[in-house]
A protein has these predicted regions:
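Catalytic toxin/effector domains delivered as secreted proteins or via bacterial secretion systems
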Residues: 14
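Active-site-adjacent loop and "lid" segments of alpha/beta metabolic enzymes
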Residues: 3-7, 17, 34-43, 47-48, ...
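Catalytic domains of carbohydrate-active enzymes, especially glycoside hydrolases
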Residues: 47-63, 255-256
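Short acidic capping loops at alpha-helix termini that bridge into adjacent secondary structure
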Residues: 183-186
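Catalytic-pocket segment enriched in acidic/His residues
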Residues: 30
Length: 297
């Protein structure tokens, strides 16, 4: 493994990528495609965070904007009011904490509180987003590939070679971040399954994911959980896509994904334990940077 692939530098933790990791999804939106409204209160969201950690989540990702196809972005203050109270409580859980947002003001306030990672579906392209992350030394960032906005993106799913074009976009964004002083070891890539892509594009990205990984200077974080393409393949509604989601996560890990972002942590963790038993060299832990009163699972 290349040295630059071995770790993901974040605010409180230097995360080892020597084994595949599981990021648990915490949606605090009323309208997410899969679990909108279930964790709308701070207490419900925190209970969900604790449940995911108990099930084995290596990281948590808290989001207050639904980015399902056709969704409209919430008001900035509304998104902030959804996310920050949950962040304030979840920071004490002892695992790396990510905020899923493109809102520069939410980024700034969350990073000021000590959040480890900004997970941005718009790859820090909104005004002030890049500068906000650059001002916070060691904060991690995940850059996702998407065209347009959630309410327009599916009309922009036109590619000559989706794998090559996704790779080119991600590499170009990394160069922009590096020019702003953000080191590559702070960056993770997401190919954006379901974002400005047809089911055929999504499957091509999975089928050729090993090729994609080899063309990128940083590792992949991949989210297939409960996505529409899985519903088309299986004929199952959103709430019945557990088996399909786990299968896609394993296929992604087998093709080089460093992190899988999932709703169903327990099942994914169990599946990865079996996968690791077949590949026993895939072992690791999350190692925090030296800091007072910080321990890692």
């Amino acid at each position: 493994m290349s040295a630059i692939w071995q770790f993901w530098q974040t605010t409180r933790f230097r995360i080892s990528l020597a084994r595949p990791l599981v990021m648990g999804i915490v949606n605090v939106t009323p309208d997410s495609f899969s679990d909108g409204g279930r964790h709308a209160s701070v207490s419900a969201a925190l209970l969900h965070c604790e449940k995911l950690v108990a099930e084995g989540a290596d990281l948590l990702d808290v989001g207050g904007e639904s980015t399902r196809p056709g969704a409209l972005a919430p008001d900035s203050e509304e998104e902030i009011s959804r996310v920050l109270p949950v962040v304030a409580e979840a920071l004490r859980l002892g695992v790396p904490l990510s905020v899923d947002t493109s809102n520069p003001e939410l980024m700034r306030r969350a990073l000021d509180m000590g959040v480890d990672i900004v997970n941005d579906v718009r790859a820090l392209q909104r005004p002030d987003a890049l500068a906000c992350v650059a001002m916070h030394p060691d904060a991690g960032v995940c850059l996702m590939h998407m065209r347009g906005e959630p309410d327009t993106m599916q009309a922009l799913a036109d590619y000559g070679d989706v794998v090559a074009e996704v790779a080119a976009f991600l590499v170009q964004r990394l160069r922009v971040l590096e020019a702003a002083g953000i080191a590559a070891e702070r960056v993770m890539f997401d190919p954006g399954i379901g974002f400005a892509k047809t089911p055929e594009h999504n499957l091509a990205l999975l089928q050729r994911q090993a090729e994609l990984c080899c063309s990128l200077p940083r590792p992949l974080l991949v989210g297939w959980s409960r996505k529409g393409t899985l519903g088309l393949i299986t004929g199952r509604p959103v709430g019945e896509r557990l088996a399909a989601s786990v299968a896609a996560a394993l296929a992604s890990v087998d093709r080089g994904a460093a992190i899988v972002r999932v709703h169903d942590v327990a099942a994914t963790v169990d599946a990865l334990k079996v996968w690791q038993a077949v590949a026993p060299s895939a072992m690791s832990t999350i190692t925090p940077k030296p800091a007072p009163a910080q321990t890692a699972r």
